[in-house]
Amino acid sequence: MSSDDIIKLLKAAGWRKVHQKGSHTQFKHSAKPGKITVPHPKKDLPLGTARAILKQAGIQP
């Protein structure tokens, strides 16, 4: 799964981009606590990293 795919899923679930520095982008949700950091741009994220990001966002893969 690429970082673009993860970002599309996050945006569809209501997460919005709040900060980017270097190769990492942070997203925040208006109703959920915390921030999610996505390494971007990256063609293929390791499977464990992709699952952890989706789990933290409350999205089922």
Language-model segment annotations:
Residues H24-K28:
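Minor-groove-contacting beta-hairpin "wing" of winged helix-turn-helix DNA-binding domains
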Residues M1-H19, A31-P61:
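Basic nucleic-acid-binding interfaces
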